[in-house]
Amino acid sequence: MRQKVTLACVQCASRNYTAAKQIRRLGERLMANKFCSTCNKHTIHRETK
């Protein structure tokens, strides 16, 4: 089963993306290199609580 999580930009903290994550991996926080429209560049996006 999967759970929806929100990804937020590390630099400006805007929440730009949603992703699905397996419930078994709840201890690990998801990180991805995505484009932030607020910063207008690719930045690291981290899973928010």
UniProtKB/Swiss-Prot annotation:
Mind telling me what this protein is named? Large ribosomal subunit protein bL33A
GO annotation, biological process: translation
Q: Name one GO molecular function term.
A: structural constituent of ribosome
Is Hydrolase set as a keyword in this record?
Answer: no
Keyword terms of this UniProt record: Ribonucleoprotein, Ribosomal protein
What NCBIfam families does this protein map onto? PRK00504.1, PRK00595.1, rpmG_bact
Q: Which InterPro entries match?
A: Ribosomal_bL33 (IPR001705), Ribosomal_bL33_sf (IPR038584), Ribosomal_zn-bd (IPR011332)
